[in-house]
């Protein structure tokens, strides 16, 4: 399993870091087999797995439950788990309690915290407590209401400077890595050049030190809309629907199960039970 030091070396050698989300055992197993460097158990599971409208309804218990499954499927991959909405905002004590629960119960290797101003102290507290932290700036889904929707961040001079400043402060607070979401490629390049920690992009251009995408987006599974920044490599929904439709039709017409799918009783036993009928 790669470690924090390995990711720093990858940045130094300009070897792109590959991160992918996973929310369950089979997805994690496939991700590890395919060779991803890191798995993110994102609170995006609220929308892509649980059918919620946003990430706001996801709980600490949800994150623990799904991370456990991912850990079983990818025991040799570095796993980052999101701290969900309001689990690190109320107090330092509350933040540490929630973080400890996630790490101890799920086996996560690091925790991801969204936001800059107001979150630096949480980053520092977790780092001092021995819990590696991945920061997340730009479009932060937990704060989408405050940001005015799912929009590109840092497009004007003032907000761009703020993102650079917050990125530096995240590193100074102890973050081992930074995720930038929906940020202009030029700004990402500047931030990646400025920081000594790896910068992982999602909708942030090719100059980031690595990339992360949502598992369901890249395989075309259960997604109604594909964001501009996503490259969809296949659409398994079509294959799945075809298979289920075939099953429905076979059952309706008694074409399934066939004899090869059934179990047979010994004739002697059958005779004893029903007189051979």
UniProtKB/Swiss-Prot annotation:
Major localization class: cytoplasm
Residue numbers binding Mg(2+): 43, 82, 114
Enzyme active site: 181 (proton acceptor)
Gene3D superfamilies referenced in this protein's UniProt entry, alphabetically: Phosphoenolpyruvate-binding domains
This protein's pathway: Cofactor biosynthesis; (R)-pantothenate biosynthesis; (R)-pantoate from 3-methyl-2-oxobutanoate: step 1/2
Residue sites binding 3-methyl-2-oxobutanoate per the record: 43-44, 82, 112
GO biological process terms held by the UniProt record: pantothenate biosynthetic process
Enzyme Commission number, as recorded: 2.1.2.11
Keywords (A to Z) from UniProt: Cytoplasm, Magnesium, Metal-binding, Pantothenate biosynthesis, Transferase
Domain of life: Bacteria
Cofactor stoichiometry and binding remark: Binds 1 Mg(2+) ion per subunit.
InterPro entries: Pantoate_hydroxy_MeTrfase, Pyrv/PenolPyrv_kinase-like_dom, Pyrv_kinase-like_dom_sf
UniProt-annotated location(s): Cytoplasm
SUPFAM superfamilies recorded: Phosphoenolpyruvate/pyruvate domain
GO cellular component entries: cytoplasm
Gene Ontology molecular-function annotations: 3-methyl-2-oxobutanoate hydroxymethyltransferase activity; magnesium ion binding
Cofactor(s) needed by this chain: Mg(2+)
Ranges that cross the membrane: none
Function, in words: Catalyzes the reversible reaction in which hydroxymethyl group from 5,10-methylenetetrahydrofolate is transferred onto alpha-ketoisovalerate to form ketopantoate.
Family: Belongs to the PanB family.
Assembly information from the UniProt record: Homodecamer; pentamer of dimers.
Protein name: 3-methyl-2-oxobutanoate hydroxymethyltransferase
């Amino acid at each position: 399993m790669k470690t924090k030091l390995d990711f720093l070396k990858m940045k130094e050698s300009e070897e792109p870091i590959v991160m992918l989300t996973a929310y369950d055992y089979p997805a994690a197993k496939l991700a590890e087999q395919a060779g991803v460097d890191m798995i993110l158990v994102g609170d995006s599971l609220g929308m892509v797995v649980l059918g919620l409208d946003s990430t706001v309804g996801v709980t600490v218990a949800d994150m623990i439950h799904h991370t456990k499954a991912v850990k079983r499927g990818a025991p040799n991959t570095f796993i980052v788990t999101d701290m969900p909405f309001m689990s690190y905002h109320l107090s330092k004590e509350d933040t540490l309690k929630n973080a400890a629960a996630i790490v101890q119960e799920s086996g996560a290797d690091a925790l991801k915290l969204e936001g800059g101003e107001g979150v630096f102290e949480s980053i520092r507290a977790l780092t001092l407590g021995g819990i590696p932290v991945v920061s997340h700036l730009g479009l932060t889904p937990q704060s989408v209401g405050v940001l005015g929707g799912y929009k590109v961040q840092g497009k004007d001079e003032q907000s761009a400077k703020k993102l650079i400043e917050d990125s530096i402060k995240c590193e100074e607070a102890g973050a081992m890595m930074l995720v930038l979401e929906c940020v202009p490629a030029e700004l990402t390049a500047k931030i990646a050049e400025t920081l000594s920690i790896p910068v992982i992009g999602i909708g942030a251009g090719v100059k980031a030190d690595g990339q992360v995408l949502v598992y369901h987006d890249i395989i075309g599974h259960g997604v109604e809309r594909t964001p501009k920044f996503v490259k969809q490599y296949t659409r398994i929904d079509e294959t799945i629907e075809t298979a289920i439709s075939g099953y429905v039709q076979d059952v309706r017409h008694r074409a399934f199960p066939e004899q090869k799918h059934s179990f047979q009783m010994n004739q002697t036993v059958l005779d004893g039970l029903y007189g051979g009928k």
